[in-house]
Amino acid sequence: MIKKLASFIFHSLGWKSVGEVPSDIKKYIIIGAPHTSNWDFFYGILFFLMKGIPLKFFIKKEWYFFPFNILLKSLGGIPVDRSKKENLTDQIADFFNQHEKLAILITPEGTRSYNPQWKKGFYYISQKTKAP
């Protein structure tokens, strides 16, 4: 019921999902684009619910404050510190490699503003983790 409702809302809002994840793949990266609004977070949740995928997403630690931190954690949010010397792709790759089964959503533009040039972090994470 949740999948059907999420799918109905997702498609009613004009979004589409391209491709399917083979059931034998335990770890993978999902690209969410374009990321031009804070509403994209809501669309991402709908996508994961529609596909029956346990939600995990990375979000800058600045968003982790009370009471939002409780909501974000319950939704699968993982805070990242972008000021650390270790770059973000390494932090995400390390997290990814610590889990046997994991799907993560990455928005490759690197900003909510329109940006036709994608950053390459998702590619480097895929290479470091050998995840499709």
Residue ranges and their predicted role:
Residues 1-3:
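Helix-enriched interaction subdomains in cytosolic or periplasmic regions
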Residues 10-132:
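Soluble catalytic domains of membrane acyltransferases
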